[in-house]
Amino acid sequence: MEKLWGGRFQGKSEAWIDDFGASISFDQKMAKEDLTGSLAHVAMLGKCGIISDAEAAEITAGLKIMQEKLALGELEFSTANEDIHLNIETLLYTEIGPIAGKLHTARSRNDQVATDMHLYLKQAVADIIHSLKHLREVLVQKAGFHVETIMPGYTHLQHAQPISFAHHLLAYFGMFTRDLERLEESVKRIDISPLGSAALAGTTFPIDRAYSAELLGFSAIYENSLDGVSDRDFIIEFLSNSSILMMHLSRFCEELILWTSHEFQFVELTDAFSTGSSIMPQKKNPDMAELIRGKTGRVYGNLFGMLTVLKGLPLAYNKDLQEDKEGMFDTVETVQTSLDIFAGMIETMKVNEEIMEESTQKDFSNATELADYLAKKGVPFREAHEIVGKLVLECTQNGIYLQDVPFSRYQEINPLIEKDIYDVLSSKTAVQKRNSYGGTGFDQIKVALANAKKSL
């Protein structure tokens, strides 16, 4: 098959080399965007008198037929035509004849592919934002059910202080809110049209870039044609934002994996989000959580891969940029699916409230309460810290907890300690009293929930 760019060449290409250079196997994901961009481009060519109205109408009709065929899965792409752009142009030629060759007037594949990617990512980010908003709604709803559910709070994966389970959920709500803000803020750098930049220097034809941008729904155009065809910052930013988002999902998944274990038993995932073992009949594995945790690494890899591709590229277009698409496509699919799976896990998981609270009775996470109690009685906090630390050691040696220490022993430690100490040491009291702004106290959780609902 003759190449559309073959005029300068005498020798024929070889199939195995064509296969290496072709991108149609993956960039066909942008067929819809490529047709959309071409429709806007031909409309602009007609408006500006670069082609006749009749020619514009004929090309437009052909492109719309191809849109219908694409929707029906009837377009067949060929590696011989390299990429989605040449495939569509070749198919258009088959549809309407030689006039199809006028479509590429005042356009290069360089600005064409950049336009496709902006269109694709703009819609993909909108879809991800929608799913992220749904996840935030799920978290708020779940937190609303568990304001007074007590669980251990951890540092170093050791029991630290008791907290409300809602407080834990709302911590992730805060993380996902920042993810949402980053994605929404990035849209303005995606929503820019490079169409009309041509190969790198613009074109001699009297085009109207603002018109084609308006037809495509872009809010701005690139001010510099070199920048327009070579910019991939918007993809890097998306990959970076996605990496942070996946990191947040992965952290929560790590906790779910721990919490579903026999050692914790804090939560139970439904069968839909679990799998079994081919040899161990009793197993119920949190595979979906593990997969999200694992897929986080591939999103990181896509980010680093893209940065590495770009780090040594001179302006403007280089074939290296063919490597900018697969990581983007993969990240879009991974993030979108991970968000939907994760929201389903959280929405349907069973919370074992009694086990959560019981676990706070078999630890020393109330030690800070005793230290604070002494400090409020006038004991310098560092001295109180020392006293309680020694008492914890004593308790561990005797196999008891702070709430089991006899009152007589508390009196020996410090006569300022009164019988209300046992109420102070209860997990519920410990949580209730932490009512500083942003704290885990029930009143503060209700404030946080109200604020979260307002932000949905």
Curated annotation (Swiss-Prot):
GO MF annotation list: argininosuccinate lyase activity
The keyword Cytoplasm is annotated on this UniProt entry: yes
Pfam assignment, any one: Lyase_1
Compartmental location: Cytoplasm
Reaction equations catalysed: 2-(N(omega)-L-arginino)succinate = fumarate + L-arginine
Superkingdom to which the source organism belongs: Bacteria
EC number(s) given by UniProt: 4.3.2.1
Gene3D superfamilies: Fumarase/aspartase (C-terminal domain), Fumarase/aspartase (Central domain), Fumarase/aspartase (N-terminal domain)
Enzyme class: lyase
Biological or metabolic pathway of the protein: Amino-acid biosynthesis; L-arginine biosynthesis; L-arginine from L-ornithine and carbamoyl phosphate: step 3/3
GO cellular component annotations of the record: cytosol
CDD domains on file: Argininosuccinate_lyase (cd01359)
Keywords on record: Amino-acid biosynthesis, Arginine biosynthesis, Cytoplasm, Lyase
GO biological process, one term: arginine biosynthetic process via ornithine
Family: Belongs to the lyase 1 family. Argininosuccinate lyase subfamily.
HAMAP family named in the record: Arg_succ_lyase
Name of the protein described by the UniProt record: Argininosuccinate lyase
Native source organism of the sequence: Listeria welshimeri serovar 6b (strain ATCC 35897 / DSM 20650 / CCUG 15529 / CIP 8149 / NCTC 11857 / SLCC 5334 / V8)
Origin organism lineage: Bacteria, Bacillati, Bacillota, Bacilli, Bacillales
Gene (name only): argH
